[in-house]
Swiss-Prot record:
SUPFAM superfamilies: PRTase-like
Source organism phylogeny: Bacteria, Bacillati, Bacillota, Bacilli, Lactobacillales
Entry's localization field: Cytoplasm
Entry protein name: Hypoxanthine-guanine phosphoribosyltransferase
Active site: 103
Length: 180
C-alpha cells in the first residue's frame, strides 16, 4: 500500500479540487478573449491540469512539454533537458505554464526565458504547489494554489522514482523511503 510510505497528508484531494475551481475562475477572467495556450509540464502536471481546465470557462488551447531536471533523486540537477517541445508556434500567443510544483525554480525560469525569446505575447506560470524555501533562482508563480514547507512531497502527479504519482492527495514521503 502506497499510504504506508506517507508520513502525513499535506493537501487533501478536496482541497486541491477547491483550489483548482478558484484558480479556474480567476483564469477565466484573466484570459477572457485571449485564447491562451496552457502548457503542461509532463509528467507531473497531468492530474492538476486535468482538474484545472474543467473550471476555465473561456477558449483555451493545450499543449505539453516534457522537461527533466530531476534525475532519479530528490534534488534538481539544474540541467534542463527538453525531451518534448510544444507542437504549436507560440509567437504572439499568451502562454500559461501549468506545473505541479516550483521548487528550485530552475526549470521554469529557463522555460520562461526561452518562451520570451520565442516572442510569446505573455508568459505566466500557474502551479499547484510552491516551495519557496527550495528556490535557487529568482522566479515567482503568477498563480499559486498552495505554498508548502521544504519537505519531499509526492502524489497528485508528483513522484519519487516514477512512483506515487497516482495518490489522490499531496503527501510527505517518509524519509526512510528515499534515504536508502
Amino acid at each position: 500500500m502506497l499510504e504506508n510510505d506517507i508520513k502525513k497528508v499535506l493537501v487533501s484531494h478536496d482541497e486541491i479540487t477547491e483550489a483548482a475551481k478558484k484558480l479556474g475562475a480567476q483564469l477565466t477572467k484573466d484570459y477572457a478573449g485571449k485564447n491562451p495556450i496552457l502548457v503542461g509540464i509532463l509528467k507531473g502536471s497531468i492530474p492538476f491540469m486535468a482538474e484545472l481546465v474543467k473550471h476555465i470557462d473561456t477558449h483555451i488551447e493545450m499543449d505539453f512539454m516534457m522537461v527533466s531536471s530531476y534525475h532519479g533523486g530528490t534534488a534538481s540537477s539544474g540541467v534542463i533537458n527538453i525531451k518534448q517541445d510544444v507542437t504549436q508556434d507560440i509567437k504572439g500567443r499568451h502562454v500559461l505554464f501549468v506545473e505541479d510544483i516550483i521548487d528550485t525554480g530552475q526549470t521554469l525560469k529557463n522555460l520562461r526565458d526561452m518562451f520570451k525569446e520565442r516572442e510569446a505575447a505573455s508568459v505566466k506560470i500557474a502551479t499547484l504547489l510552491d516551495k519557496p524555501e527550495g528556490r535557487v533562482v529568482e522566479i515567482e508563480a503568477d498563480y499559486t494554489c498552495f505554498t508548502i514547507p521544504n519537505e519531499f512531497v509526492v502524489g497528485y502527479g508528483l513522484d519519487y522514482k516514477e512512483n506515487y504519482r497516482n495518490l489522490p492527495y499531496i503527501g510527505v514521503l517518509k524519509e526512510e523511503v528515499y534515504s536508502n
